[in-house]
């Protein structure tokens, strides 16, 4: 009886009822202040979609906001979205979005009702709910998602731009997080370093003081250190000193390193005697390669710190307020200041200096945190080198969020990595497919070693079907593939671990604050859903420019739709749900007799042909690599490098000839090699592979 009276009262106030279905246009002008929307989906996607229609109205979300929105209250507030736990906290302004499970809180409210259903449950709600207005708008339907997708992404980028402007500098965020950690563990490494929050900050402050004296007149400082306690202390110390950090790739050629040093104008390089000794055993002579620079050793810095100075600093860290410590020890920096200069791998050409500003670094750390859902009790296995953008960002995700990181300097040391994860009970592992392949093949690494891992993310190179199958069969762990480039700081897309399905064969959905498009590589016209073309990207994590290379910067940037986009150089497509598939790099296509041939696809076809003959790469450790070289008659020819010891080139040629592989794809040359050239990051060194192939062809 009470509900009938309530409904009658509402009718008198509204004069009419509005009933819509998904086949009619919804007039969103009818959403007046005080309207209530009940939905069976109140995720961040739905809320942002609603905001594109209700741009001028405030949206309050009552409960059940999904986990992806946690920590983003400030971001949402900037664009007029907030969420509450109970109806009593609503100020009756704008529109209230209510999760279906909390409808009882609003059923007897005297506000205008609108029923907003996001799925097939509409009839159920229509029959049992006493609501005045009913709308069936199926946002989950593909056609509706496509319409909303672009506006949502535009809103997302705009929102994140505003969010970043409110953040403190990376050094201060990291510094404060370590202070908040207090006596809790934040970092360990395999050399025996164990640091809690107070010790980490103390070490960084003491090191920062000494480094400021040494590098007083320098803007860019080189770092040649492994993934270790010393490496991360040096990074924070230099951040506190407002220096741009250049993590040097000690696995690169001497020529590439000298180019990087000269381009960045580096005068001082921070390293350690223990690490130099290890590099010397591997044939890398630091003092020769870095002869043009002043080399500063961590051991010498440590020796200059007196015991009394250490105790005094430690007590200050424990006693003084964070705001005082920040003012005393951190040099002020702006979001537009340079944070890192990361040189590209040089896998295809001379290394480029990618300028990562504070805003780019922060954006990608928080974007990554949002999509991989890093938790406070997570511990990251830090195995990727700090000169690797992927390794650096993922490590900072942990350190910025209050988790801890366990470091091992050599990602190719399968047993060492396994021991690290087992000992520290790590929950997150980020590695390239090459490293995952090594762990799978190593018989001394077993399922129990990786038992504590809840999340495994791979990127930097394409994840092959073989590596995925082998790894998941051996360790019973799912791999989440992602995508990015150093120019994007670097994470741009990833298959979410929980909230969205892990769509095998794709690299997932774009990170929040970013947007992909597929364009024709020549005309630059946007291509429809599902059509392959050039991948371009814009977002808050996109670099502004290459160091001292305006020409190259202009080559990779394009003005489109009123924004600046980065041309990735990768061929791919986006499906109707927004998942990105990367086919290959455009540079990994050969032009044979006027036709474009994907070298990556050829490699997969060869693996398949060999498997049919009993040479299964899941069981036998070997690799194949297709390389295109110039040819006067055909434009380019394809040569196949392979490491299968038991097979002669003539035998492999016969297998390919009878395999059904199209003639256009069949290699001209077959070369058995000891190993495929690799970079320190685990990626294939295409530059060296091409050089090797040219030498073999000439021979």
Q: Model-derived features: where do they sit?
A:
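Conserved AMP-binding/adenylate-forming core of the ANL superfamily
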Residues: 185-217, 222-232, 236, 253-258, ...
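AMP-binding/adenylate-forming catalytic domain of the ANL superfamily
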Residues: 298-299, 633-636, 659-684
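Conserved ATP/PPi-binding loop(s) of AMP-dependent carboxylate-activating enzymes
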Residues: 509-513, 525-557, 595-601
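AMP-binding/adenylate-forming catalytic core of the ANL superfamily
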Residues: 269, 429, 539, 544-545, ...
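Gly/Ser/Thr-rich phosphate-binding loop
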Residues: 298, 310-319, 426-431, 440-502, ...
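A cross-family acyltransferase "interaction/gating" segment
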Residues: 24-29, 54-57, 65-150
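Conserved AMP-binding/adenylation subdomain of ANL enzymes
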Residues: 362-379, 387-427, 442
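Conserved pre-ATP/AMP-binding loop-to-beta segment of ANL
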Residues: 183, 295-343, 349-350, 373-379
